[in-house]
């Protein structure tokens, strides 16, 4: 069974992870989309048992993209559309519900490899996860009151 991928949405209706993904150059965006389609939707949280994932605690995990689209699709036996490019991306995620992976944020570690930058990005993802959980608990409470 495959996992569904959703983008975090803030109170203003913006989806910062989607905006970040769209801001990447075409080669990096293609690698990220391929990794999401080939790895994340198939493995979900189990991606943390591979080189592509790492548990960060408190419901947050890191999805690591180290290969370009051609390598990712090639490993899955799929045809690629482009030439090889260097890629080092991180996407922060949360697994919830019935096989849903929520994308909370991401950054290009190849451009900004410092631990400080990674720490800031993880904290942003944690803040978004807290906001998501608050909204979810509010929806459940409202649904119970309507019954």
Which residue stretches match the model-derived regions?
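Active-site beta-strand-loop-beta-strand hairpin of nuclease catalytic cores
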Residues: 95-103
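Short, surface-exposed beta-strand/loop micro-motifs that present aromatic residues
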Residues: 89-94
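Basic, Lys/Arg-enriched alpha-helical interface segments
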Residues: 1-87, 108-147
